[in-house]
Amino acid sequence: MLFDQIASNKRKTWILLLVFFLLLALVGYAVGYLFIRSGLGGLVIALIIGFIYALSMIFQSTEIVMSMNGAREVDEQTAPDLYHVVEDMALVAQIPMPRVFIIDDPALNAFATGSNPQNAAVAATSGLLAIMNREELEAVMGHEVSHIRNYDIRISTIAVALASAITMLSSMAGRMMWWGGAGRRRSDDDRDGNGLEIIMLVVSLLAIVLAPLAATLVQLAISRQREFLADASSVELTRNPQGMINALDKLDNSKPMSRHVDDASSALYINDPKKGGGFQKLFYTHPPISERIERLKQM
């Protein structure tokens, strides 16, 4: 059951990434069709933009991410309990020892960052260290180490980059339509009098309008799948599903973080640091903790 869940989550993530690339290609084709008379040309430009966005975000410095979240680096002497747990989990996962940071915040939370295991780092809040017992801390750090081992940060970064590229292209198309670019193209098409041209025009406009929302939803779906995968992978490392369940239960009852957390960093944390309600739940980067616990109970 454990390995079935891991395989299923990986498969769903790759399907969602494929959908992402198709969305980017669709928007690029639509913009190219409407404004440069070449759908293929627009598609190529869109893929190049997405690639550049992804590269620039993947190589973002770990120091920048940690600084944005108010984290300070610790070592074996200054935080031995946390350091040794991370060391144990990294050893079991067969990855290099990540750098270790602490965030001074009473809320219970943790995250990992780094585009690959060689430059990875993990961070935990002081509140997490004060409340979690050894088994629960192992489960949380197993979750974060699993993100590193599974290259989740890189995958999530690619998803954010593709979503940003799609939004940028759609916004650019909107401004061009505002200044009359689409109107000139439409006039040319009307003179051609081709029904297929009209259909293509409508489809292109719909793609430009709806793609940013679709991209956001796909990005969130990828983030949720990686959380499920990291939970299951943590159990694989610790061989202790109850430890993960108990940790998640405590995380669920934790208050939001006291410091401001930007949207990009929010997706990194094991527990949504903002904990909004109502309509905001549709755009959560994390699946409900109750659902995560239920999946663990099924193992």
Curated annotation (Swiss-Prot):
Pfam families: Peptidase_M48. It is found in: Cell membrane. Binds 1 zinc ion per subunit. It is a multi-pass membrane protein. GO terms for cellular component: plasma membrane. GO terms for molecular function: metalloendopeptidase activity; zinc ion binding. Keywords: Cell membrane, Hydrolase, Membrane, Metal-binding, Metalloprotease, Protease, Transmembrane, Transmembrane helix, Zinc. The chain crosses the membrane at residues 15-35, 39-59, 158-178, 198-218. Zn(2+) binds at H143, H147, E227. Its cofactor is Zn(2+). Its EC number is 3.4.24.-. The active site is at E144. GO terms for biological process: proteolysis. Its main location: membrane. HAMAP family: Pept_M48_protease_HtpX (MF_00188). Belongs to the peptidase M48B family. PANTHER family: PROTEASE HTPX (PTHR43221:SF1). This is Protease HtpX homolog. It comes from Streptococcus pneumoniae serotype 4 (strain ATCC BAA-334 / TIGR4). The gene is htpX.
